[in-house]
Amino acid sequence: TIGVGESTTQFFRDWTLEMNLPDNWMDECEATYKYSVKFKNFSEYGDFHYPFWDGGAPSNSSCDILEWFFHYRATNGNPEVSFAEWMTPYWRIIEENKVVINDFESFKGYKNAGYHLDAVKFSNMLKRDFCLPRGVVHHIDTIKDCIKDTDGNIASLVGEKDIYLADMFIDCTGFKSSILGGMMGVEWDDFPFLINNKAWAVRTGYTDKKTEMTNHTVCTALDNGWVWHVPLTTRIGTGYNFSDKFISEEDALAEFKEFLGDRPLLSEPRLIEWKNGIAKKVWCKNVVGIGLSAGFIEPLESNGLLSVHNFAVYLADALSMHDGKVNTLVRAHFNRRCRKHMSQFAHFVGNHFMMTTKTNSDYWRYITDNINYMDDQAEDEQGTHGGYPLDDFPLNIDTLSKFNFNDIAGNAYICAGHMHSPITPWTMDYLSLIHISEPTRQLQI
Protein backbone atom coordinates (compact mmCIF):
# COMPACT_ATOMS: atom_id res chain seq x y z
CA THR A 1 0.00 0.00 0.00
CA ILE A 2 1.07 3.58 -0.61
CA GLY A 3 -0.11 4.24 2.93
CA VAL A 4 -1.22 7.87 2.94
CA GLY A 5 -4.88 7.28 3.75
CA GLU A 6 -7.12 5.63 1.22
CA SER A 7 -10.43 6.62 -0.30
CA THR A 8 -12.55 3.70 -1.50
CA THR A 9 -15.49 3.28 -3.84
CA GLN A 10 -18.91 2.08 -2.70
CA PHE A 11 -18.09 -1.40 -4.02
CA PHE A 12 -15.57 -1.78 -1.21
CA ARG A 13 -18.46 -1.72 1.25
CA ASP A 14 -19.90 -4.85 -0.40
CA TRP A 15 -16.63 -6.60 0.36
CA THR A 16 -16.59 -5.52 4.01
CA LEU A 17 -20.13 -6.84 4.41
CA GLU A 18 -19.17 -10.11 2.75
CA MET A 19 -16.17 -10.43 5.08
CA ASN A 20 -18.39 -9.73 8.09
CA LEU A 21 -15.81 -7.41 9.62
CA PRO A 22 -16.20 -6.71 13.35
CA ASP A 23 -18.09 -3.58 14.33
CA ASN A 24 -14.97 -1.91 15.68
CA TRP A 25 -12.92 -2.14 12.48
CA MET A 26 -13.68 1.47 11.53
CA ASP A 27 -12.41 2.75 14.88
CA GLU A 28 -9.18 0.79 14.58
CA CYS A 29 -8.58 1.99 11.01
CA GLU A 30 -9.61 5.61 11.72
CA ALA A 31 -12.29 5.21 9.05
CA THR A 32 -15.02 7.65 8.05
CA TYR A 33 -17.93 7.23 5.65
CA LYS A 34 -17.75 8.47 2.08
CA TYR A 35 -20.88 9.29 0.07
CA SER A 36 -19.46 11.26 -2.83
CA VAL A 37 -16.46 12.78 -4.58
CA LYS A 38 -16.41 16.55 -4.86
CA PHE A 39 -14.45 18.12 -7.70
CA LYS A 40 -13.31 21.66 -7.04
CA ASN A 41 -11.85 23.99 -9.66
CA PHE A 42 -11.99 21.30 -12.37
CA SER A 43 -14.64 23.18 -14.33
CA GLU A 44 -15.23 26.79 -15.19
CA TYR A 45 -18.89 26.11 -14.38
CA GLY A 46 -18.17 25.58 -10.69
CA ASP A 47 -17.67 22.68 -8.31
CA PHE A 48 -19.61 19.46 -8.74
CA HIS A 49 -20.25 16.14 -6.98
CA TYR A 50 -20.22 12.51 -8.05
CA PRO A 51 -22.37 10.92 -5.29
CA PHE A 52 -22.84 7.18 -4.82
CA TRP A 53 -26.36 6.17 -5.74
CA ASP A 54 -27.60 2.94 -7.30
CA GLY A 55 -31.29 3.34 -6.58
CA GLY A 56 -32.27 4.21 -10.13
CA ALA A 57 -34.11 7.28 -11.31
CA PRO A 58 -35.97 8.90 -8.39
CA SER A 59 -39.20 9.36 -10.35
CA ASN A 60 -39.00 5.87 -11.90
CA SER A 61 -39.00 7.52 -15.30
CA SER A 62 -36.92 6.01 -18.09
CA CYS A 63 -35.76 9.45 -19.18
CA ASP A 64 -34.54 11.13 -16.00
CA ILE A 65 -30.93 11.42 -17.13
CA LEU A 66 -31.91 12.80 -20.50
CA GLU A 67 -34.51 15.04 -18.89
CA TRP A 68 -31.86 16.95 -16.94
CA PHE A 69 -29.72 17.52 -20.02
CA PHE A 70 -32.82 18.52 -21.93
CA HIS A 71 -33.66 20.98 -19.18
CA TYR A 72 -30.06 22.23 -19.23
CA ARG A 73 -30.33 22.97 -22.95
CA ALA A 74 -33.81 24.48 -22.60
CA THR A 75 -32.55 26.90 -19.93
CA ASN A 76 -29.60 27.98 -22.10
CA GLY A 77 -27.10 26.30 -19.81
CA ASN A 78 -28.52 27.64 -16.54
CA PRO A 79 -30.21 24.65 -14.88
CA GLU A 80 -32.18 25.33 -11.72
CA VAL A 81 -30.52 22.39 -9.92
CA SER A 82 -27.31 20.45 -10.44
CA PHE A 83 -27.36 17.03 -12.02
CA ALA A 84 -26.25 15.46 -8.73
CA GLU A 85 -29.16 17.08 -6.89
CA TRP A 86 -31.56 16.04 -9.65
CA MET A 87 -30.50 12.39 -9.50
CA THR A 88 -29.62 11.85 -5.82
CA PRO A 89 -32.37 11.92 -3.16
CA TYR A 90 -29.99 12.63 -0.26
CA TRP A 91 -28.06 15.41 -1.98
CA ARG A 92 -28.60 18.02 0.74
CA ILE A 93 -27.50 15.58 3.45
CA ILE A 94 -24.15 15.24 1.68
CA GLU A 95 -23.83 19.01 1.44
CA GLU A 96 -24.64 19.34 5.15
CA ASN A 97 -22.01 16.70 6.00
CA LYS A 98 -24.40 14.32 7.74
CA VAL A 99 -24.89 10.55 7.82
CA VAL A 100 -27.41 9.53 5.20
CA ILE A 101 -29.47 7.07 7.29
CA ASN A 102 -30.42 7.40 10.96
CA ASP A 103 -31.60 3.78 11.30
CA PHE A 104 -28.24 2.20 12.05
CA GLU A 105 -29.55 -1.36 11.96
CA SER A 106 -30.63 -0.95 8.35
CA PHE A 107 -27.44 1.00 7.68
CA LYS A 108 -25.43 -2.20 8.10
CA GLY A 109 -26.78 -3.34 4.74
CA TYR A 110 -26.58 0.07 3.12
CA LYS A 111 -24.41 -0.02 0.01
CA ASN A 112 -24.32 3.57 -1.26
CA ALA A 113 -21.28 4.44 0.82
CA GLY A 114 -17.55 3.94 0.66
CA TYR A 115 -14.91 4.66 3.27
CA HIS A 116 -11.90 6.80 4.01
CA LEU A 117 -9.47 4.61 5.93
CA ASP A 118 -5.86 4.10 6.93
CA ALA A 119 -4.76 1.40 4.50
CA VAL A 120 -1.76 0.31 6.58
CA LYS A 121 -3.86 -0.20 9.71
CA PHE A 122 -6.53 -1.94 7.66
CA SER A 123 -4.08 -4.42 6.14
CA ASN A 124 -2.53 -5.11 9.56
CA MET A 125 -5.98 -5.79 11.00
CA LEU A 126 -6.82 -8.21 8.19
CA LYS A 127 -3.56 -10.07 8.75
CA ARG A 128 -4.04 -10.29 12.51
CA ASP A 129 -7.77 -11.07 12.66
CA PHE A 130 -8.43 -12.97 9.42
CA CYS A 131 -5.31 -14.33 7.74
CA LEU A 132 -3.21 -15.69 10.60
CA PRO A 133 -6.15 -17.34 12.43
CA ARG A 134 -7.02 -19.13 9.18
CA GLY A 135 -3.61 -20.72 8.85
CA VAL A 136 -1.72 -18.20 6.72
CA VAL A 137 1.99 -18.30 7.59
CA HIS A 138 3.79 -14.95 7.38
CA HIS A 139 7.51 -15.14 6.58
CA ILE A 140 9.48 -11.90 6.80
CA ASP A 141 12.33 -12.11 4.31
CA THR A 142 13.97 -10.32 1.40
CA ILE A 143 13.70 -12.16 -1.92
CA LYS A 144 16.91 -12.08 -3.93
CA ASP A 145 16.37 -14.47 -6.83
CA CYS A 146 14.24 -17.26 -8.23
CA ILE A 147 14.70 -20.75 -9.65
CA LYS A 148 12.67 -21.63 -12.74
CA ASP A 149 11.73 -25.00 -14.15
CA THR A 150 12.20 -26.03 -17.78
CA ASP A 151 8.82 -24.53 -18.77
CA GLY A 152 9.69 -21.09 -17.41
CA ASN A 153 7.53 -21.35 -14.31
CA ILE A 154 9.01 -20.22 -11.01
CA ALA A 155 9.78 -23.32 -8.95
CA SER A 156 11.03 -21.42 -5.92
CA LEU A 157 11.94 -17.98 -4.64
CA VAL A 158 15.34 -17.55 -3.05
CA GLY A 159 15.35 -15.32 0.02
CA GLU A 160 18.06 -14.20 2.40
CA LYS A 161 16.74 -16.57 5.08
CA ASP A 162 15.15 -19.44 3.18
CA ILE A 163 13.96 -20.88 -0.14
CA TYR A 164 10.20 -20.84 -0.78
CA LEU A 165 8.51 -23.43 -3.00
CA ALA A 166 4.94 -23.06 -4.31
CA ASP A 167 2.67 -23.93 -7.22
CA MET A 168 1.69 -20.27 -7.71
CA PHE A 169 3.25 -16.96 -6.70
CA ILE A 170 1.23 -13.75 -6.19
CA ASP A 171 3.29 -10.63 -6.83
CA CYS A 172 2.32 -7.92 -4.33
CA THR A 173 5.67 -6.10 -4.49
CA GLY A 174 4.11 -2.78 -5.45
CA PHE A 175 5.45 -0.50 -8.15
CA LYS A 176 8.68 -2.54 -8.31
CA SER A 177 6.80 -5.56 -9.69
CA SER A 178 9.82 -7.60 -8.66
CA ILE A 179 8.44 -11.00 -9.68
CA LEU A 180 5.98 -10.34 -12.53
CA GLY A 181 7.97 -7.58 -14.19
CA GLY A 182 11.44 -8.40 -12.89
CA MET A 183 11.79 -12.18 -12.81
CA MET A 184 9.17 -13.00 -15.45
CA GLY A 185 10.01 -10.05 -17.71
CA VAL A 186 6.38 -9.09 -18.35
CA GLU A 187 6.20 -5.78 -20.20
CA TRP A 188 3.95 -2.83 -19.43
CA ASP A 189 1.26 -1.07 -21.46
CA ASP A 190 1.00 2.63 -20.65
CA PHE A 191 -2.16 4.72 -20.60
CA PRO A 192 -0.63 7.64 -22.53
CA PHE A 193 -3.62 9.94 -22.04
CA LEU A 194 -2.98 10.01 -18.26
CA ILE A 195 0.05 12.26 -17.82
CA ASN A 196 0.26 12.71 -14.03
CA ASN A 197 3.14 10.51 -12.87
CA LYS A 198 4.20 11.82 -9.46
CA ALA A 199 2.69 13.00 -6.20
CA TRP A 200 3.78 14.65 -2.99
CA ALA A 201 1.87 12.97 -0.15
CA VAL A 202 1.61 14.04 3.47
CA ARG A 203 -0.51 13.56 6.56
CA THR A 204 -1.94 16.68 8.15
CA GLY A 205 -3.93 17.56 11.22
CA TYR A 206 -7.25 19.36 11.34
CA THR A 207 -7.63 23.08 11.81
CA ASP A 208 -11.45 22.94 11.84
CA LYS A 209 -12.56 19.33 12.20
CA LYS A 210 -16.27 20.12 11.96
CA THR A 211 -15.94 21.40 8.40
CA GLU A 212 -12.83 19.52 7.25
CA MET A 213 -13.88 15.97 8.21
CA THR A 214 -16.24 15.74 5.26
CA ASN A 215 -18.40 12.78 4.31
CA HIS A 216 -16.92 12.91 0.82
CA THR A 217 -13.49 12.94 -0.80
CA VAL A 218 -12.43 16.32 -2.17
CA CYS A 219 -10.30 16.68 -5.31
CA THR A 220 -9.07 20.22 -6.03
CA ALA A 221 -7.45 21.20 -9.32
CA LEU A 222 -4.32 23.37 -9.11
CA ASP A 223 -2.20 24.87 -11.90
CA ASN A 224 -0.21 21.70 -12.57
CA GLY A 225 -2.38 18.86 -11.30
CA TRP A 226 -4.80 18.21 -8.49
CA VAL A 227 -4.87 17.63 -4.71
CA TRP A 228 -6.71 14.87 -2.88
CA HIS A 229 -8.28 15.40 0.56
CA VAL A 230 -9.16 12.17 2.42
CA PRO A 231 -10.46 12.87 5.95
CA LEU A 232 -9.93 10.19 8.61
CA THR A 233 -11.06 10.43 12.22
CA THR A 234 -7.69 11.64 13.55
CA ARG A 235 -6.00 13.23 10.54
CA ILE A 236 -6.24 14.04 6.84
CA GLY A 237 -4.46 12.19 4.06
CA THR A 238 -3.61 14.61 1.29
CA GLY A 239 -1.35 14.77 -1.73
CA TYR A 240 -0.60 16.69 -4.91
CA ASN A 241 -0.68 14.72 -8.17
CA PHE A 242 1.30 16.34 -10.96
CA SER A 243 3.17 15.71 -14.20
CA ASP A 244 6.92 16.26 -14.24
CA LYS A 245 6.58 17.34 -17.87
CA PHE A 246 5.24 20.67 -16.63
CA ILE A 247 6.65 21.27 -13.16
CA SER A 248 9.71 20.17 -11.21
CA GLU A 249 9.45 18.18 -7.99
CA GLU A 250 10.71 21.17 -6.01
CA ASP A 251 8.24 23.62 -7.55
CA ALA A 252 5.39 21.14 -7.13
CA LEU A 253 6.20 20.80 -3.44
CA ALA A 254 6.25 24.57 -3.06
CA GLU A 255 2.87 24.86 -4.81
CA PHE A 256 1.48 22.10 -2.59
CA LYS A 257 2.72 23.74 0.61
CA GLU A 258 1.21 27.04 -0.48
CA PHE A 259 -2.11 25.27 -0.98
CA LEU A 260 -1.92 23.66 2.48
CA GLY A 261 -1.24 27.00 4.14
CA ASP A 262 -0.86 26.79 7.92
CA ARG A 263 -2.31 23.30 8.21
CA PRO A 264 -0.17 21.29 10.70
CA LEU A 265 1.94 18.58 9.05
CA LEU A 266 2.03 15.23 10.86
CA SER A 267 4.66 13.74 8.55
CA GLU A 268 7.31 14.87 6.11
CA PRO A 269 6.08 15.16 2.50
CA ARG A 270 6.92 11.97 0.61
CA LEU A 271 7.44 11.76 -3.15
CA ILE A 272 5.62 8.93 -4.95
CA GLU A 273 6.39 8.04 -8.57
CA TRP A 274 4.41 5.73 -10.84
CA LYS A 275 3.54 4.68 -14.37
CA ASN A 276 -0.11 4.69 -15.38
CA GLY A 277 -0.77 1.39 -17.11
CA ILE A 278 -1.35 -2.33 -16.91
CA ALA A 279 0.91 -5.36 -17.29
CA LYS A 280 0.62 -6.99 -20.71
CA LYS A 281 0.01 -10.25 -18.85
CA VAL A 282 -1.27 -9.95 -15.30
CA TRP A 283 -1.01 -13.75 -15.11
CA CYS A 284 2.18 -15.11 -16.67
CA LYS A 285 3.08 -18.79 -16.24
CA ASN A 286 2.54 -19.40 -12.51
CA VAL A 287 2.89 -15.76 -11.41
CA VAL A 288 -0.07 -13.42 -10.89
CA GLY A 289 0.26 -9.72 -10.17
CA ILE A 290 -2.25 -8.10 -7.83
CA GLY A 291 -2.18 -4.48 -6.76
CA LEU A 292 0.42 -1.96 -7.87
CA SER A 293 2.62 -4.66 -9.42
CA ALA A 294 -0.11 -5.42 -11.98
CA GLY A 295 -1.37 -1.96 -12.84
CA PHE A 296 -1.98 1.56 -11.64
CA ILE A 297 -4.20 4.52 -12.46
CA GLU A 298 -3.69 7.91 -10.86
CA PRO A 299 -6.01 7.99 -7.82
CA LEU A 300 -8.63 10.47 -9.01
CA GLU A 301 -11.48 7.95 -8.58
CA SER A 302 -10.08 5.63 -5.88
CA ASN A 303 -9.33 2.68 -8.12
CA GLY A 304 -6.47 1.23 -6.05
CA LEU A 305 -8.26 -1.00 -3.55
CA LEU A 306 -11.04 -1.67 -6.07
CA SER A 307 -8.60 -3.22 -8.54
CA VAL A 308 -6.99 -5.29 -5.76
CA HIS A 309 -10.42 -6.62 -4.82
CA ASN A 310 -11.49 -7.28 -8.40
CA PHE A 311 -8.25 -9.01 -9.42
CA ALA A 312 -8.45 -11.26 -6.36
CA VAL A 313 -12.05 -12.16 -7.19
CA TYR A 314 -11.15 -12.76 -10.85
CA LEU A 315 -8.36 -15.09 -9.73
CA ALA A 316 -10.67 -17.01 -7.39
CA ASP A 317 -13.15 -17.37 -10.24
CA ALA A 318 -10.43 -18.61 -12.59
CA LEU A 319 -9.10 -21.18 -10.15
CA SER A 320 -12.59 -22.56 -9.57
CA MET A 321 -13.45 -22.98 -13.26
CA HIS A 322 -11.97 -26.48 -13.68
CA ASP A 323 -11.39 -27.61 -10.10
CA GLY A 324 -8.09 -25.77 -9.94
CA LYS A 325 -6.78 -27.03 -13.28
CA VAL A 326 -5.27 -24.14 -15.21
CA ASN A 327 -4.70 -23.94 -18.94
CA THR A 328 -4.03 -21.22 -21.48
CA LEU A 329 -7.72 -20.35 -21.80
CA VAL A 330 -8.13 -19.80 -18.05
CA ARG A 331 -5.12 -17.47 -17.94
CA ALA A 332 -6.22 -15.62 -21.09
CA HIS A 333 -9.71 -15.07 -19.71
CA PHE A 334 -8.31 -13.75 -16.43
CA ASN A 335 -5.91 -11.41 -18.24
CA ARG A 336 -8.72 -10.13 -20.43
CA ARG A 337 -10.91 -9.33 -17.42
CA CYS A 338 -8.11 -7.52 -15.59
CA ARG A 339 -7.02 -5.48 -18.60
CA LYS A 340 -10.60 -4.57 -19.48
CA HIS A 341 -11.29 -3.38 -15.93
CA MET A 342 -8.18 -1.20 -15.88
CA SER A 343 -8.66 0.15 -19.39
CA GLN A 344 -12.26 1.18 -18.81
CA PHE A 345 -11.44 2.78 -15.47
CA ALA A 346 -8.45 4.59 -16.96
CA HIS A 347 -10.68 6.14 -19.59
CA PHE A 348 -13.22 7.07 -16.93
CA VAL A 349 -10.46 8.95 -15.10
CA GLY A 350 -9.29 10.44 -18.39
CA ASN A 351 -12.78 11.77 -19.05
CA HIS A 352 -12.45 14.10 -16.06
CA PHE A 353 -9.61 15.81 -17.91
CA MET A 354 -10.98 15.39 -21.43
CA MET A 355 -14.14 17.36 -20.67
CA THR A 356 -12.55 20.27 -18.85
CA THR A 357 -12.26 23.67 -20.48
CA LYS A 358 -9.54 24.93 -18.13
CA THR A 359 -6.76 26.79 -19.96
CA ASN A 360 -5.14 28.77 -17.14
CA SER A 361 -1.72 27.05 -17.38
CA ASP A 362 0.48 25.14 -19.82
CA TYR A 363 -0.53 21.95 -18.04
CA TRP A 364 -4.26 22.46 -18.56
CA ARG A 365 -3.83 23.76 -22.11
CA TYR A 366 -1.89 20.60 -22.97
CA ILE A 367 -4.60 18.44 -21.40
CA THR A 368 -7.40 20.14 -23.31
CA ASP A 369 -5.65 20.59 -26.66
CA ASN A 370 -2.93 17.96 -27.14
CA ILE A 371 -4.10 14.62 -25.75
CA ASN A 372 -6.06 12.14 -27.84
CA TYR A 373 -8.35 10.52 -25.30
CA MET A 374 -10.27 8.43 -27.81
CA ASP A 375 -7.45 6.49 -29.45
CA ASP A 376 -5.36 3.88 -27.66
CA GLN A 377 -4.73 0.16 -27.41
CA ALA A 378 -8.21 -0.48 -26.00
CA GLU A 379 -10.27 1.57 -28.43
CA ASP A 380 -13.05 -0.98 -28.49
CA GLU A 381 -13.49 -0.68 -24.70
CA GLN A 382 -13.12 2.99 -23.99
CA GLY A 383 -16.32 4.67 -25.07
CA THR A 384 -18.57 4.01 -22.11
CA HIS A 385 -18.69 4.01 -18.35
CA GLY A 386 -22.03 3.87 -16.64
CA GLY A 387 -23.99 3.43 -19.86
CA TYR A 388 -22.74 6.71 -21.30
CA PRO A 389 -21.62 6.39 -24.96
CA LEU A 390 -19.10 9.24 -25.20
CA ASP A 391 -17.96 8.09 -28.62
CA ASP A 392 -21.49 8.74 -29.92
CA PHE A 393 -21.69 12.38 -28.83
CA PRO A 394 -23.62 14.42 -29.60
CA LEU A 395 -26.76 12.30 -29.60
CA ASN A 396 -28.69 12.30 -32.85
CA ILE A 397 -31.29 10.16 -34.59
CA ASP A 398 -28.85 7.28 -34.99
CA THR A 399 -27.19 7.38 -31.57
CA LEU A 400 -30.07 8.41 -29.32
CA SER A 401 -31.20 4.81 -28.99
CA LYS A 402 -27.78 3.80 -27.60
CA PHE A 403 -28.10 6.09 -24.60
CA ASN A 404 -28.75 4.09 -21.43
CA PHE A 405 -31.28 6.29 -19.64
CA ASN A 406 -31.48 4.08 -16.55
CA ASP A 407 -27.78 3.97 -15.64
CA ILE A 408 -26.77 7.09 -13.72
CA ALA A 409 -23.24 6.04 -12.81
CA GLY A 410 -19.91 7.42 -13.87
CA ASN A 411 -19.70 9.61 -16.89
CA ALA A 412 -23.20 11.08 -16.61
CA TYR A 413 -22.11 12.97 -13.48
CA ILE A 414 -18.77 13.99 -14.96
CA CYS A 415 -20.37 15.23 -18.18
CA ALA A 416 -22.97 17.17 -16.22
CA GLY A 417 -20.33 18.67 -13.95
CA HIS A 418 -18.45 19.97 -16.97
CA MET A 419 -21.72 20.94 -18.70
CA HIS A 420 -20.80 18.57 -21.51
CA SER A 421 -24.30 17.90 -22.80
CA PRO A 422 -25.30 15.19 -25.28
CA ILE A 423 -28.20 17.39 -26.36
CA THR A 424 -27.53 19.92 -29.12
CA PRO A 425 -30.09 22.50 -30.28
CA TRP A 426 -30.68 20.31 -33.33
CA THR A 427 -31.31 17.30 -31.11
CA MET A 428 -33.82 19.36 -29.13
CA ASP A 429 -35.72 20.09 -32.33
CA TYR A 430 -35.69 16.39 -33.16
CA LEU A 431 -36.96 15.43 -29.70
CA SER A 432 -39.73 18.00 -30.00
CA LEU A 433 -40.79 16.45 -33.28
CA ILE A 434 -41.25 13.08 -31.61
CA HIS A 435 -43.25 14.73 -28.80
CA ILE A 436 -40.69 14.65 -26.00
CA SER A 437 -41.15 17.90 -24.15
CA GLU A 438 -39.43 19.61 -21.22
CA PRO A 439 -39.32 17.69 -17.94
CA THR A 440 -42.70 17.62 -16.29
CA ARG A 441 -41.34 16.59 -12.91
CA GLN A 442 -41.32 19.52 -10.50
CA LEU A 443 -37.81 20.79 -9.89
CA GLN A 444 -37.08 21.08 -6.18
CA ILE A 445 -34.99 24.10 -5.26
Language-model segments: residues:
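Predominantly flavin-linked oxidoreductase catalytic cores and closely associated redox partners
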Residues: 110-225, 230-252
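A conserved active-site cap/scaffold subdomain adjacent to cofactor or substrate pockets
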Residues: 266-268, 280-335
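Conserved FAD/dinucleotide-binding core of flavoprotein oxidoreductases
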Residues: 222-274, 295-306
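A conserved mid-domain beta-alpha-beta active-site/ligand-binding segment of alpha/beta enzyme cores
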Residues: 377-418
